[in-house]
């Protein structure tokens, strides 16, 4: 097992958790692209925080628990994790699907949280049933997905250079991502009516070129959370931790220090 990675058993699940760095605790919830794409940014965060970064069950080759079938299962798993670690004044940082997860945690219980940061989060549906608020990344071909995810599509991983093992992990990540987010697609229709319960300072960080959930979506999200602030990151798409990591880091540090 790599340094800094431990296994914590919760709900009968052997949860892999990275715990590295010193400073205020920061719980990092990765997006649907899997934990591996967040590792470089995670390492930068460890220079300033005690980072706690679980791998969502089903990602990175881990099994999906038999009793898991919705994102809500992750919500209660991570509420249990916060209790088990007995951490307080936590900065909760979530990316994309992980941002939705972070918002769901915060509407239930903020007693262990100090601040909430949502990076290009999904989770709400501003429009009606017939409105496509969130791009369908599961149906689109790879080149189209790259254009949705990246300001510069050439930054997208080249599948032709991946090993069979890497492709296997990618496929299992995709299955887990779909299981957590497919029905209803990438949102909880009740979340918008609960966001007023968030009582900690909240920052939304958004790539200016996000093709999955555009800026208009971010503005609606911001307006639903009391006192929330939205900061737009230029030359970044849905994954600013990959395209503009230093800019993203500075915004996280500035907000956490307030």
Regions found by a protein language model. Name each.
Residues 11-63:
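Conserved HGGG/HGGXW glycine-rich cap/lid loop of the alpha/beta-hydrolase fold
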Residues 52-93, 242, 250-253:
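Active-site loop/oxyanion-hole signature of alpha/beta-hydrolase fold enzymes
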Residues 100-108, 113-144:
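Flexible "cap/lid" loop of the alpha/beta hydrolase fold
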Residues 127-133, 139-199:
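Conserved alpha/beta-hydrolase catalytic His-Asp/Glu region
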């Amino acid at each position: 097992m790599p340094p800094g990675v431990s296994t914590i058993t919760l709900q009968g699940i052997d949860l892999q958790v990275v715990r590295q760095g010193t400073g205020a605790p920061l719980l990092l919830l990765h997006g649907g692209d899997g934990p591996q794409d967040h590792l470089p940014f995670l390492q930068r965060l460890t220079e300033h925080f005690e980072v706690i970064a679980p791998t969502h069950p089903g990602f990175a080759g881990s099994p999906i628990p038999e009793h898991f079938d919705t994102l809500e299962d992750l919500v209660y798993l991570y509420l249990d994790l916060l209790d088990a670690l007995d951490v307080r004044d936590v900065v909760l940082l979530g990316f994309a699907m992980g941002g939705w997860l972070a918002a769901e945690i915060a509407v239930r219980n903020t007693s262990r949280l100090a601040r909430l940061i949502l990076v290009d989060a999904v989770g709400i549906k501003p429009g009606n049933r017939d409105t496509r608020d969130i791009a369908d990344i599961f149906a689109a071909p790879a080149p189209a997905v790259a254009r949705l995810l990246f300001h510069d599509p050439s930054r997208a991983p080249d599948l032709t250079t991946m090993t069979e093992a890497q492709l296997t992990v990618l496929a299992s990540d995709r299955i887990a991502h779909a299981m957590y987010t497919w029905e209803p697609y990438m949102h909880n229709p009740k979340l918008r009516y609960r966001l007023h319960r968030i009582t900690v300072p909240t920052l939304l960080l958004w790539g200016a070129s996000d093709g999955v959930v555009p800026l208009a979506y971010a503005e609606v999200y911001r307006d639903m959370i009391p006192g929330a602030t939205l900061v737009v990151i230029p030359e970044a798409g849905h994954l600013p931790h990959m395209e503009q990591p230093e800019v993203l880091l500075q915004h996280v540090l500035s907000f956490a220090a307030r």
